């Protein structure tokens, strides 16, 4: 599962102010929708998170991972697209979709989803994108339903008891 933060786990962008990362909108709590993601991922313990957020470029991998407020989400983080592309000098200029497609190809992933507020770069894989609208994020009940449905389609493993 590739994860963008801004306009996904909270309903606005964020920026660095001094030593802190703050929401661009007054009154918005960063990671306000983290518990929703935690709830939706709960039935899928083997699904890891790859950070596809610009926070990695600003705070580094550990800083971005550790910014996640829930231990259950931090423990799922297995990598970041920007780290994986660090040998590519222009990788920071690629869209999230392009970074993710490179990661998928390099690691030969067969099953994946991405939560992002941008569609660019995902054109070849529209079914893998859980698109969050800017200003709403995972707070949108329709997006939550889409996420639940796509998680089932992509990661559900049938057992002998089903």
Roles of regions detected by a PLM:
Residues 1-43:
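Active-site neighborhood of HAD-like aspartate-dependent phosphohydrolases
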């Amino acid at each position: 599962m590739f994860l963008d933060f801004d306009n996904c786990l909270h309903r606005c962008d964020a920026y660095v102010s001094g030593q802190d990362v703050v929401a661009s909108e007054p009154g918005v709590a960063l990671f306000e929708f983290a518990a929703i993601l935690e709830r939706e991922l709960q039935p899928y313990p083997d699904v890891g998170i790859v950070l596809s957020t610009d926070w990695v470029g600003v705070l580094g991998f550990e800083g971005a991972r550790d910014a996640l407020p829930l231990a259950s989400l931090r423990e799922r983080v297995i990598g970041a697209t920007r780290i994986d592309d660090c040998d590519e000098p222009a990788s920071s200029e690629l869209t999230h979709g392009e970074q993710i497609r490179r990661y998928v190809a390099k690691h030969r992933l067969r099953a994946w989803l991405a939560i992002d507020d941008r569609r660019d770069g995902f054109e070849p894989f529209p079914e893998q994108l859980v698109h969050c609208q800017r200003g709403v994020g995972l707070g949108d009940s329709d997006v939550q339903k889409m996420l639940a449905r796509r998680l089932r389609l992509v990661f559900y493993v049938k057992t002998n008891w089903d």
